[in-house]
Structure formats: C-alpha cells, structure tokens
Amino acid sequence: MNNQFKLKNKKIKPVSILIILFVGFLFLISLIGFIFTSFYTIDLKLAIFFEKGFKYEIVRYWSIFYDILGTTELMVFILFNIMVLIESWFLLKSKTKKDNFWKKNKWILKLVYITVYVVFVVIKCITTYFKINADNGFGYGGDAIYLLSSKYRNICLIVSLVIHCIGLFVGFYIIHYKFKNDPIYLVDKYWIQAVKILFIVLISYTILVLLKGMTSRPYYYNIIYGDLLKQVKLNGHNDWVDHYLNQSTFKHGFNIGDNKYANNIPGEWPWYRINGGLFRPDKNLVQFKHWFDWAFPSGHIGATLIVGCTFFYFLTNNQKLTPLKITLLALYFLHLVSMSFAIVVNRGHWVSDITFTYLWLLPLIFLTHFFNSFFKFKDIGCKKY
C-alpha cells in the first residue's frame, strides 16, 4: 500500500468559497468581539445584558438545554467517526479476492454496531438517572447553578437523552447502509474525513483543558453568587439557601472566611487574569474538581464547531449539494449561533470565552481541512480487486 501523497490540481468549488467567506466573516466578528470584551467592563456589561433573558420561562428551557447539550453532543459524533473507520476497515478487507477472516465473518461488524449502541444507551441512561435531582448545592428540588427549580435541568436531561439515543441510531444506520454503498467510499473519502475530525478533537481538547486549568476563570454566575442567593431568598426559597450554607461540598461563590462561599467574587476578572496560580486556583474562590470545568475558553463552542466539521466534511465531500444537505448545513449554523448565545444567557460563559474559542479553533479546522484538500493519499482502498 503506497502512502505517498501528491498535490491535487483542482479548482476550489463555489460551495467551498461560500464556506470560506462564512468562516472568514465569523472569524472577523469574533476578532472584533474578543478585542472589545478584553476590556472587563464591556464583558461584564454584555453578561448583565444577556442575563435579562433568563427570567423568561421559554428562554430558561432553551438555554439550559443547550448548556447540557454542549457537554454531551460531541461524544455521539466521535462515535460516528470511529464507526466510519471501522466500517472502512471491514469494507476494505471484504473487497479483496482472497478469503480472509473479516470477509468470512461480516456479522462481526453488525455486532460492533449493536454493542456500541447498547453500551452508549445504557451508560447514558444511568448517568442521566443519577443527574436527575442530583444535589449540586441546594438539595432536593433546587439547582444551585441556575438558581432555579431542578425541574428545568431534569426535563432538559431527559430530552437530551432521547435526542442522543435517536441521533446515534440514525447516524449508525446512515453510515452502515448509506455511506458505505458510495462507490468511492474508500478512495480519499469518508475514512480520511473521520481521521481529520478525530485529530481535531484530540488537539482542540488538549488545548481547551490546558487553557481552562491554567486560567481557572470563574463563570459570571460565580462572580455574582451572593446577589443570586439573596434573590433566591426573595423568591421564597430560604430552604435552598439554608441547605447551601450548611453543606461543604459545593463552593460556587466567594469565601469571606466563614467557608460558606456565599458572596460575590470581588475584583475584575478579564480572560487574561490568572486565578491564583497556574493550575492552582485561589482557595477562597469557587472550586471545581477538574481543569475542564472552568470558563475560559468555551468547551461548548469547541464541541459544537467539531460537530460542524462532521456535517461539513461528510455532506460536502466531493459531492453535489442537494436541497436536503443545504438545509442540514443551514440548521447547523443556526444551532451554532443558538449555542453561542444560550451559554451566555444562563449566566455561564462570558462573551470573551466564546469569541476566543472561535479565534483559535476555526483556523485549526480550516488548516486541517485544506491541508487534505491540497494533498491526497494514493492507492488507499482504490484498487480494483
């Protein structure tokens, strides 16, 4: 098998030009936004402005659903890409003239699909079960992160579970019964796209975790946690606040010396301010268990952009765009915009968290994709057996 590569001599398609223009526009907006929100006063004013939408019932459900979705959706698409690689391996082995183990035992592939799906559903159901009504500081019935009833989180968890299980099933069906029937499935096509996406996942999440751990930036709700607790009391939920003050596991605010972590965090917290020391956050501020739990940069946007890679790579890869594919891409772009606003509205991420994520992840995705556009591997799965 020859792994040499050579330059492709092909013109850039109109759809690629449109994508480049869209990405360029998104990058430019993010750059401008990041420059302005590097001033903490502007970042804070935007957080205060967007927070106003969280008082509306429908906005709460939308925002919390996206917050939950952003932490889980990527795994579904990682499994898609892994199965593309496995499918490609089986397809390559089954096309050879010689009999081999894989050609004689094609049932193994279906077993892999079934096993992966069942394991995913079981794990997802178990984790969702334990997350429903789980205590995160307010005890049963309250949510110490959103400062609301836990019903919002519970409903969104269930909806997310259903969507993921259905989505994974549909995706596996398409990969196994649709994509593999493409006559050039193995020729510089789906398996290469899967490798690119998994590469982006590895690099991007390494960067994300390191930056989050280094800066340990609090979320907006952590900064104003004292005010939020007062509002919860005014809304008649003294029991939630009392429960929070009498527990020591969850620390969402600032510790003034009483170990309650029930006050606003003083000072300014722009994205470039290090909380305590590198990977050593101040013990008097909000505490999280993992590096990736902190605010800067946004893992939600990172995950959603990588999901977009899967849509873009697989729907436009050497194929004509159909109305259905255009619709799916348009829906994805709406999803991306929706995610960008939702995680600000619920007092979570700062605008600077989001704009910065676009600034470094878009170039990584762009360079990874267009490196493959100019170089191609020869003789990988393209023999006629």
UniProtKB/Swiss-Prot annotation:
Membrane topology listed for this record: Multi-pass membrane protein
Keyword check for Transmembrane: yes
Name of the protein this chain belongs to: Uncharacterized protein MCAP_0865
Top-level taxon in the UniProt lineage: Bacteria
Transmembrane feature ranges: 17-37, 72-92, 107-127, 155-175, 191-211, 295-315, 326-346, 354-374
Major site of localization recorded for this protein: membrane
Record flagged with keyword Transmembrane: yes
Cellular compartment(s): Membrane
GO annotations of cellular component type: membrane
Keywords annotated in UniProt: Membrane, Transmembrane, Transmembrane helix
